[in-house]
């Protein structure tokens, strides 16, 4: 019996030892690999010349094993060549060329930042190397930054040579040169030949190397860049990412919520203005159903809330439009129609004031804060304007302007801005305010007393906006808070032209500064268009963080705008 037990123990030890030997590897619990991979060797070597046009293989060796699928989406050859992938142990990549190279041509091989190792660590920046079938390597370069992308998000940079085609059909053809944005959105295109280029930053979700503007975000440049002996390298061609919409909006459906409220579904967010044409008739007798109010739905920008007179349960309604416009400026002027019948439900929501800001007895309010009102039901804003009163500490009545945000809420801005170290009282005669159907709210007089922060708790930022050329159009600065804390998160200032600025009453904290040139004078940044093509407006983002201290003016915060190209 002891011999059998001994044999069993011996066998167990042997099997355990064998298993441990067979599963050798990195010891568990070691540090996680966070080191980004790098390219350690290429063939041809970078800057090689007189490379034969019948070159068949390009080799790329990485510092560690790569995730092969990610690399296949991140390798580009410019000008484009047809090739196949072959791997050796996931570290050495061979590109098997199936084309004949052009004579006297510099070729650029780019490995973008989407390429990652087996631990999902991406290349820190795009890697490029070049070789030539001729006697020299082209040395032109364009660099810049892509703004508005998410952390770890990558955008492709497409470079088109304008002389490649008589038509600027950027949607239909692939770019001559390609790179990818890297850490913090930085990008560079190297080894460019002398010519004029138009660049785009492209999301390229399907990796087809085409601009699919209908569903991909893109960045349009502010000008074209010419590379020549006088300007071999250009730095500072930056992009702001946006959705360049080219499709006109249209109705997608309608839902009666109750007998006075409709939800009109549209293909994309609309701009509601005086031109927006919506009307409703009963198709049985052509009687008109009056629309009392409309606004964008709180929960979905693709829904328009429409409030009407009480609907007839026997009617067959049709909602018509011959003009709607989306937020990108695309207009639909064709006749559109949706059919619906009344919902029998009745809205029983009580008439209440949901929010009144500043709150009663609020202290240390920031001067840029408007008076904000929000109601439980769609309100007749004319009745609000007639029954609202704002007084300063000397009991003087202050006039101002209402900014209607929706049928439910609005902001009041006094004609003379609120002052620091001062107190105010806002009165609302609630009993004389009515909803869209004329129903009055409960009779009461509401007043809010509030005081503003001391000027000793605020700081200032000043400097100069400059540009090499003066063009007609105002300049808009935005000072945005980066650190957490109380107070307004951003400050906006308009200048008639580039020049000296001063932003006052800024809470203590860290801020970023940006500026754009409103050349089309529409009071917002224009990101450019593909059809018909137009450049983006010039903008600039200050690289340094601004630290604002109370009772202190942060001076000399200067920022320069780039000069745009022509249309």
Label each residue range with its predicted role.
Residues 21-184, 188-202, 214-218, 243-461, ...:
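Acidic, low-complexity Ser/Thr/Gly/Pro-rich repeat segments typical of extracellular/periplasmic
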Residues 125, 203-243, 335-338, 343, ...:
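Structured interaction patches on ligand/partner-binding surfaces of diverse proteins
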Residues 1-37, 501, 564-567:
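Bacterial Sec-dependent N-terminal signal peptides
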């Amino acid at each position: 019996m002891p011999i059998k037990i001994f044999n069993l123990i011996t066998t167990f030890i042997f099997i355990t030892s064998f298993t441990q030997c067979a599963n050798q590897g990195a010891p568990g619990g070691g540090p996680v690999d966070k080191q980004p991979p790098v390219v350690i060797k290429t063939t041809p070597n970078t800057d090689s010349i007189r490379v034969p046009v019948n070159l068949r293989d390009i080799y790329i060796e990485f510092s560690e094993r790569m995730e092969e699928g990610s690399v296949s989406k991140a390798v580009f050859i410019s000008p484009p060549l047809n090739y196949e992938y072959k791997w050796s142990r996931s570290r050495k990549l061979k590109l098997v060329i199936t084309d004949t190279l052009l004579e006297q041509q510099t070729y650029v091989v780019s490995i973008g930042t989407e390429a990652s190792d087996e631990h999902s660590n991406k290349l820190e920046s795009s890697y490029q190397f070049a070789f030539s079938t001729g006697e020299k390597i082209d040395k032109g370069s364009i660099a810049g930054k892509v703004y508005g992308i998410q952390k770890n998000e990558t955008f492709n940079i497409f470079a088109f040579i304008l002389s490649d085609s008589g038509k600027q059909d950027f949607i239909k053809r692939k770019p001559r040169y390609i790179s990818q944005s890297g850490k913090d959105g930085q990008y560079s295109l190297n080894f460019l030949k002398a010519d004029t280029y138009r660049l785009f930053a492209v999301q390229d979700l399907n990796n087809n190397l085409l601009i699919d503007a209908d569903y991909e975000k893109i960045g349009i440049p502010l000008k074209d860049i010419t590379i020549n002996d006088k300007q071999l390298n250009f730095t500072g061609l930056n992009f702001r990412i946006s959705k360049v919409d080219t499709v006109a909006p249209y109705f997608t459906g309608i839902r009666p919520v109750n007998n006075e409220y409709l939800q009109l579904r549209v293909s994309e967010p609309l701009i509601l203005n005086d031109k927006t044409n919506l009307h409703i008739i009963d198709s049985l007798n052509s009687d008109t159903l009056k629309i009392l109010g409309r606004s964008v739905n709180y929960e979905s920008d693709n829904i328009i809330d429409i409030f009407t007179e009480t609907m007839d349960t026997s009617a067959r309604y049709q909602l018509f439009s011959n003009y709607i416009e989306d937020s990108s400026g695309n207009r639909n002027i064709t006749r559109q129609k949706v059919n619906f019948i009344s919902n029998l439900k009745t809205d029983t929501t009580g008439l209440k004031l949901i929010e009144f800001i500043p709150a009663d007895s609020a202290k240390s309010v920031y001067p840029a804060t408007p008076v904000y009102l929000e109601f439980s039901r769609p309100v007749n804003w004319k009745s609000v304007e007639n029954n609202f009163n704002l007084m300063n500490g000397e009991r003087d009545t202050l006039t101002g302007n209402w900014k209607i945000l929706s049928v439910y809420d609005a902001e009041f801005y006094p004609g003379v801005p609120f002052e620091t170290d001062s107190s105010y009282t806002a009165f609302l005669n609630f009993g004389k305010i009515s909803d869209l159907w004329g129903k009055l709210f409960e009779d009461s007089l509401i007043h809010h007393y509030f005081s503003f922060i001391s000027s000793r708790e605020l700081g200032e930022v000043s400097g100069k906006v400059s540009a090499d050329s003066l063009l007609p159009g105002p300049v808009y600065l935005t000072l945005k808070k980066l650190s957490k804390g109380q107070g307004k998160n951003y400050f906006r200032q308009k200048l008639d032209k580039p020049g000296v600025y001063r932003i006052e009453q800024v809470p203590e904290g860290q801020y970023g500064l940006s500026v754009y040139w409103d050349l089309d004078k529409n009071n917002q940044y224009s990101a450019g268009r593909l059809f018909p093509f137009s450049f983006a407006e010039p903008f600039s983002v200050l690289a340094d963080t601004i630290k604002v201290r109370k009772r202190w003016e942060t001076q000399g915060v200067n920022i320069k705008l780039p000069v745009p190209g022509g249309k």
